[in-house]
Design a protein with these regions (language model features):
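Short helix-to-coil transition segments within interhelical loops
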Residues: 36-39, 130, 204, 210-231, ...
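Transmembrane alpha-helical segments of polytopic membrane transport and secretion proteins
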Residues: 15-54, 133
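Membrane-interfacial helix termini and adjacent extracytoplasmic/periplasmic loops
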Residues: 30-40, 73, 77-86, 91-94, ...
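Interhelical loop and adjacent transmembrane-helix boundary motif
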Residues: 1-7, 39-44, 70-77, 84-100, ...
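Transmembrane-helix boundary motif in ABC transporter permease subunits
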Residues: 12-27, 111-142, 206-208, 219-226
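Transmembrane alpha-helices
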Residues: 5-7, 12-13, 50-63, 144, ...
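Cytoplasmic-entry segments and transmembrane alpha-helices of multi-pass inner-membrane transporters
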Residues: 41-52, 122-157
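Loop-to-helix entry region at the N-terminal start of transmembrane alpha-helices
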Residues: 51-54, 97-109, 147, 156-193, ...
Length: 290
């Protein structure tokens, strides 16, 4: 099933690149005219508002359920909780798993974001600026982590990092999976940074980089003074996405983190869920905090 998903995803991506990736309009000058707002009056305005409110409420239902469950004392057989309390939030933050898990998640997500920014910029540069054969294949391979289920990748990392295997050094002496989790998070979120960097390179004018090189600037100085300032907004957006999704990564966290002192925040939420009595309320409260 995974092989079928990979083949279909790669084929669809390459087809979309072939059909839609030929345009070079990103470097064209921006139009000077300003777009005008169109005010919808009467029933059109009310209908548009109703559609947006309906979509917003539908998308907010899971979040609303978590918030209500985190503050409920007794909720059975009714639409809303009969009583609300803030004790679950205090108890969740006071649990011995919570603060270390937040620190671990910040460490793992920050490391993954740095890896994604470095690799993402390098891969995007090869895809957009180089003339190496196989650039389209590299572009497709980078997007594959979005098509592979997280549990499949997690079990693959777990198998490769077992004692006696080639990548067993990624697990510390005391079983610390920090390096393994950083790599797993980085691979899962690398497509976001690559796509952001590719978009930035396509929109920036290559003539600026060529002018700097022709005037004697070394490649690293050109990158620092010309390319990176032009790509800063794109890299910032990609880095934020990579960090945010890595903070709340579920599949890799549940499989690769097995000791309580190494739990990221998502594994801590799962552990609180299994607490006897008010486990669901505590897990929901920590989910709201997260």
């Amino acid at each position: 099933l995974v092989a079928v998903m990979l083949i279909i995803s790669s084929a669809v991506f390459l087809l979309s690149k072939a059909l839609l990736g030929r345009s070079r309009l990103g470097t064209a000058p921006r139009p000077k005219g300003r777009s005008e707002e169109r005010v919808l009056k009467g029933w059109k305005g009310w209908l548009t508002t109703l559609v947006f409110v309906g979509v917003f409420l539908l998308a907010s239902l899971p979040h609303l359920g978590v918030i209500l469950l985190s503050s409920a004392t007794d909720w059975y057989g009714s639409v809303f909780p009969e009583q609300v309390t803030g004790a679950h939030y205090r108890e969740a933050l006071g649990h011995p798993l919570v603060v270390p898990s937040i620190q671990n998640s910040l460490l793992y997500a920050s490391g993954a974001m740095i890896v994604d920014l470095v690799l993402g910029l390098a891969i995007a540069w090869v895809i957009v600026r180089s003339t190496i054969r196989g650039r389209a294949l590299l572009d497709a391979l980078v997007m594959l982590p979005l098509a592979v289920p997280g549990l499949v990748l997690a079990f693959g990392y777990l198998a490769l990092a077992q004692e006696g295997r080639a990548f067993s050094f990624l697990v510390g002496v005391n079983g610390n999976p920090a390096a393994l989790l950083i790599i797993a998070y980085a691979v899962r979120r690398l497509p976001y940074v690559v796509r952001a960097a590719v978009a930035g390179l396509q929109q920036s004018n290559v003539a600026l980089e060529e002018a700097a090189l022709s005037l004697g600037a070394p490649p690293l100085r050109m990158m620092r003074r010309i390319a990176l300032p032009l790509l800063s907004a794109n890299l910032l957006a990609g880095g934020i996405l990579a960090f945010a999704f890595a903070m709340l990564e579920v599949s890799d966290s549940l499989i690769l983190a097995q000791q309580a002192e190494h739990f990221p925040i998502t594994k801590a939420i799962y552990a609180l869920l299994n607490t006897l009595g008010n486990g669901y309320e505590l897990a929901s409260a920590l989910g709201v905090w997260a």
